[in-house]
Amino acid sequence: MIEELEKRIIQNIQKIPPVPLSLFLSGGIDSSLVLALVRKTYPQTPISTYTLAKSKDYPDMIYAREVAKLFKTDHHEIVIADGDFRYFQNKYDKIKKYNFKGDINIYILCFYAKKFSNIVLTGDGGDECFGGYWLHEYPLGHKETGRIRSIEEIHPAPRKHIEEMVRMGFRNFLFKEKSDTEDYNAVWEYFIQCLAPKHLEPLLHTAELLDIQIFTPLFSESFLSFIRTLPYMERIGRKIEKQLALKYLPESVVQRESIGFDVALEPAGDSIGYL
């Protein structure tokens, strides 16, 4: 399965022309794995990587720096001051179509990445494909305390997603005593069909405005078709993704806890830097 997974990702990468490339690098498993396989596919292609954060010692900056050095990219660390953040926010407010958290971060990265190449790669889709969200693994309906009385008893943080799932007909799954395999497959499809487009739409919209081509090697119809053939327990918790990533990446990168790109500038840093 590991070999087939790698083959499928590389097939997506091979659709990208071997010209100078830009890549959004958070130092997490998704973007780092994409970088590793892009470098394997195109060993001589110039690659410029971009990391956005609120300070130079932000975890994403530290891990991305390590990965960029490993794969010999032209790496850029972008730290945004409050005043510069407002500048970008004002520009983005005039053109934005969506209002999702972290959209401005995408706009800033695209702004800088285009300076090197109008072809940009991202690790988007990894959480959805490889079961990176808590709900993929959380033992819903297997509560030792018995019947669940409220949404907060399931999990307090993602209430908005739980409420949306209830509206979509997942109430029985969330509150019943035992969950079936079909239920978990339905949750996986929920993230693919509903959340993934919400994550990608702001990126694609910004890319269109800035005349950038976006490639997501971890998210395509053919790739999803392959992932659906895997046993559910292999799909969730990033199990198969981590096994592949360990072939190319340090364990510290593969096993690190995800912070979330949408909070990379909360709060903004003290100065703007572009190296």
List each language-model region with its residue ranges.
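Substrate-binding beta-hairpin/strand module that engages nucleic acids
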Residues: 256-262
